[in-house]
Amino acid sequence: MSDTSTLPLRVLFCCGVTQNFFDLPREQIGEVWQAYGKMLAAIESMEGVKVLGIMDDDRLTVGHADNSPWTFYIMADVRNFDTTVAVCNLYRTTPVGEYNLWRYGKIEARVGRALQVPPQHANAA
């Protein structure tokens, strides 16, 4: 098995919108989406972050879902814990008008490692 001290963290960033987003008048929603676009671009350009994919799951759940409060997910390999914190901090620093993105959304990071099947079990029939 690989030396886990040199491997990046495998992070699932769970992102959602809050009731403040749904309470906005239609003409103001676009400004929030533009902020999300800027935040996603900032994540993809961060040193120490390799975005593996972004999944949007609101095709079958429209609006706020209490049992699944997330709207989209970002799977990324991240250099270290501090870089993971910096990604989450973008919600505090990305402007949306006179506020910041965290007024309209939320983020949670699930940190782990890439799953690897031990070599002795990889080819077992």
Pin down the residues of each PLM region.
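Short S/T/G/P-rich N-terminal loop/turn motif that feeds into the first structured element of a domain
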Residues: 1-70, 78-82, 112-125
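Conserved, mostly hydrophobic/aromatic
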Residues: 74
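Hydrophobic side chains in well-ordered alpha-helices
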Residues: 86-87
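A common structural junction motif
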Residues: 91-102
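A short, structured active-site edge motif that brings together acidic residues
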Residues: 102-111
